[in-house]
């Protein structure tokens, strides 16, 4: 009996999810160095995290809904592009405004990636394979946070906190390429977007 293989979809989704978890851990371990290098006040430094948290939470439901309506592949690639570009800006940030704005945009990218990775797995795998894929997804949550602390501390001590974000750029480009090549585009549901509900979910 031939053993089933997860193929390329599982590595794509897990790596994408890992990146957003790792970056949050890097922010946690590198906050002092970020504040010093950009001359941030305590309030500005707090907003480096808060801006991300607000946009991530605010856009999470809308992002999941858009992936249902417009198709997982398209929305996932948009999320990767937003995440990669904002990571580039964060890595090159020279002041508080640039850093906070880029973190807010990165939160939007992460809010797209997080639900879409899980949805892609649910669409791709069934039965026992789906159960295993979800267990790997859950394990990635813990591993991503823990490894992020190690990577963030190491990069901050020996190189620069900026590298932790700049490394996202080639990785998101790789993920976009793999998604383009291997993820099958499926039509979304033919329903109208509830603009009022979407606006309220973002504002809430």
Describe each PLM feature range.
Residues 36, 86-91, 106, 179:
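MFS-fold secondary transporters
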Residues 39, 71, 92-98, 126, ...:
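Helix-breaking motifs and short loop linkers at transmembrane-helix boundaries and internal kinks
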Residues 157-204:
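Hydrophobic transmembrane-helix bundles of small-molecule transporters
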Residues 104-139:
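Cytoplasmic helix-loop-helix junction between adjacent transmembrane helices
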Residues 58-97:
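Conserved MFS/SLC helix-loop-helix module at the cytosolic interface between two early adjacent transmembrane helices
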Residues 33-35, 64-65, 69, 154:
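Membrane-interface helix termini in secondary transporters
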Residues 50-64, 114-118:
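Central cavity-lining transmembrane alpha-helices of secondary-active solute carriers
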Residues 8-53, 113:
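Extracytoplasmic
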């Amino acid at each position: 009996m031939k053993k089933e293989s997860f193929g390329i979809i599982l590595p794509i989704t897990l790596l994408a999810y890992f990146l957003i978890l790792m970056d949050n851990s890097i922010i946690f371990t590198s906050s002092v160095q970020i504040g010093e290098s950009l001359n941030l006040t305590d309030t500005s430094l707090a907003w480096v995290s808060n801006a991300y948290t607000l946009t991530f939470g605010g856009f999470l439901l809308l992002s999941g809904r858009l992936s249902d309506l417009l198709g997982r592949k398209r929305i996932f690639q948009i999320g990767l592009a937003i995440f990669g570009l904002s990571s580039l800006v964060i890595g090159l940030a020279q002041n508080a405004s640039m850093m906070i704005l880029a973190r807010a945009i990165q939160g939007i990218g992460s809010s797209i990636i997080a639900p879409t990775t899980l949805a892609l797995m649910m669409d791709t795998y069934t039965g026992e394979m789906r159960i295993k894929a979800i267990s790997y997804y859950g394990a990635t949550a813990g591993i991503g946070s823990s490894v992020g602390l190690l990577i963030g501390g190491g990069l901050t001590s020996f190189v620069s906190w900026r590298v932790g974000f700049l490394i996202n750029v080639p990785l998101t480009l790789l993920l976009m390429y793999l998604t383009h090549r291997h993820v099958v585009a499926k039509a979304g549901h033919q329903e109208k977007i509830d603009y009022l509900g979407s606006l309220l979910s973002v504002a809430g």
